[in-house]
Structures are given as C-alpha cells and as structure tokens.
Amino acid sequence: MKAQDTLTVMQYNLLYYGNYQSGYADCYETNNNTQQKDEYIRTILDYVKPDIFTVCEFGSTATLHNDFLRHNLNIGSTNYWQTDNILNYANSNIINHIFFDSRKLGMKKHVALRTTPRDTDIYELYLKTPGLAAGDTTKLICIVAHLKAGNTASDRKKRLNQMQTTMYYVSQHYSKDNVLIMGDFNLYGASEDTYKLLTQTYSDPDALFKDPLYEVGGVGEWTYNSQFAAFHTQATRRYSEECFSAGGLDDRFDFIMMSYEVAYGYDHLRYVRNSYKAVGNDGKHYNQSVNQGSNTAVPTAVADALYGCSDHLPVTMKIFADVSVGVDETTEPDLMAFVAPNPVKDYARVSFYNPKHGNVQFDLYSLQGQLLQRTTEAFDEGPQQFELSLQDQPQGFYLLKITHSNGWRQTVKVVIK
C-alpha cells in the first residue's frame, strides 16, 4: 500500500447467499440461485471496486467463503483477495463475513461476540504500509453486525441488547482506534434507542460512532419518508417476488458508521467527505424498484444486478490513508491535550503542552459538528492548564478542538454531566 492511498469500503446484505436449508422467507435455489447471484455480484464489484467488502446473510457452510473468493473475487489473474475462517457461536444458518485486498491490508485478529440472534464479528485489520517493517502499524477495526428485524418493542429491545454488548467491547478494547461498524441494523429511525446508543448515549464517549449522513441530511425518521429518498437501502423491488422483500426503496436499514478517529483523521485514516453512498440510489426511486425506468446513479447493468441480487442496496464509503514515513515530527508537535476529570460539570480543566508562545483557540462542537462556543487565549511555551467555562452547555457529549496560532491542533472528547 502506498504511503498515501484511498480505501473503498462496501457493506452488503446478500439475501441468504448460499443457504437454502431452512426455506427462510421462501428463499430457495429456484428463486435465489447462488450461481445467478454470483453474476450480479461480479457486476457490482466491478463497478464499486472495493478494498474491504463486508457482508451479511452469508451462508454458514464451511467452504462457502472459499467458493465465493474463487467465483467472484480471485478470478482471472487476480489472486490477492483474502478472507478469514468462519466463527459461528450462535449456530446461525446465515452469518457475517469479510473479504479484503491483501495487497493493502492484513488481518491480525477475528473475534465473534456471542450476541443474539447472530454473532457480531470484529475484524482487526492492519495497513500494509511502508513503515510496517519498522513496527509502525495503522489498524482499522471492522465490526459487522446483523441486528434483529422487525418493529415490535421486543425486536427493538433485542437490537439494543446486541449493540450494548458490542459497545462495551469497543469501549474496553478499541476506544482510541480507527473503527467502522457496519451491517444490516434494521433501524427504523434516528429516535430508536439503538441508533442513539451508537451515536449519542453510550456512557463512554470515546466509543461513540458518527453517522456519515448526518452532515448531508440523512438522519431522522427515514422509514416510509420521501424526504429521505436519497438514503434508503431497501427494498430493491416494488412488488413481492417470494424471497425478496417488496415495497420499493423506503427503508434505511444498512449502515457504515465510523469512530471519531476516522471521522476527523486522528490516526492516519480519515473519512473522505461526501463519499458515503447507497449504491444505485439516485433519490428518484422512492417506493419503486431500483431499475424502474432510468437510474441516474449507476449504469443500467448495475441497476439490474442490484435488483436481481438482493432486496438491499450495498453502502460504500472512502477512507483516505496518510501513513507517510520519514516525516520530521518536529513540524507537527504533539499538544498532548487532555481533560481531567472527565466528565465535567461547569468548567473543563484542559491540560496541554504549548510548543511555542502564541494564541490557542478552544472550539467546542456538538457531535454533529455544530460550533457551540469559541475561546482564544495567549499562552507561553511549556506545560499549560486552562479552565474552560461550559456553564451555558447542557449535559451531553462534545468535541473540543484545540488549535495553536501556528496551525498545530488536537481534538479531545468532553462529557458534561
């Protein structure tokens, strides 16, 4: 992988790929044929060209992931796609899985959390960068989850329980890392407790995720709501055809969320703004099939493949990687900023190292990126402390961006109780 590169990530619910044993939702080989799906998948992969490809509703047969590699990824002269062994503690007939470009990425670890109704899979990847041999490792954690379907109180509670287990694991192991959480979340709106847990209410602010669609108006009560037509991911078909859900595009069930490390590029990886897409959603197919008439988002062959392969659309995003080696570290001094104690009440005691006499600006942001207050003070060189008044701010989670007049900056998370 080059010192500066861009990774494309794709998450896709493959609709009972390679599994017919249960007849789930009337899905059989006759109406959800794996060989036919492979043709559609190859068309979609050739269009998106992902570097990381995560999936839900993948059959749990032991050899299926190798067959998938051979038929869809490592074809012709291509031989660099890899995957990992299946873990399936829940003994489900459909599982999550991952495929990745081994020229750019390696896998250090795969953990499956014992959640209900299916395992939550955590893949710890690392970038194969120029500095890797010297021990300079940049990690990217991909968490793939398929939450309980349905909109009853019991369904919502099961989704919440699964993500509470997951968030605790993130808090304990990956709270300062580059993390993506993706999958079919079956969420009906941003007011659902599970969505709020992931983005706002979990007790450890370092474990929270950011929804890439917040900044472009994609967060709200999206189900059966034409105002969110550009963001829906299900269903690809207007009319019921046994295995496939019907109704056209009117739900946002499929997600990739990112840790704030990825959102703001704290650790060599940074989300490319406005790169998040539901592949094939042109905003003009609300309650319609994705290939009805013309589709301005993708070529006709891709729209037809999306219609044929699954009742979900894949979602994608791009991540810029800057892992340059040999940089003079003195050009970017570490402010070593932290807030302690944290949570805070009326004031935040900010400790930091000032590399050079000058003005330092303190900007407080909401988790959604809204600037709430700005304070600027002059500081001498050396260790510093500053009492930042937060009396006008309600309880919640915030981001404090600290910027020196020379351009050196750092962002820390703050909890007001």
Q: Over which residues does each language-model region extend?
A:
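C-terminal tail/sorting-segment detector
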Residues: 379-381, 395-417
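Short, glycine-anchored, charge-dense loop/turn motifs used at functional sites
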Residues: 364-372, 398
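Short strand-edge motifs at loop-to-beta-strand transitions and within beta-strands
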Residues: 121, 382-388
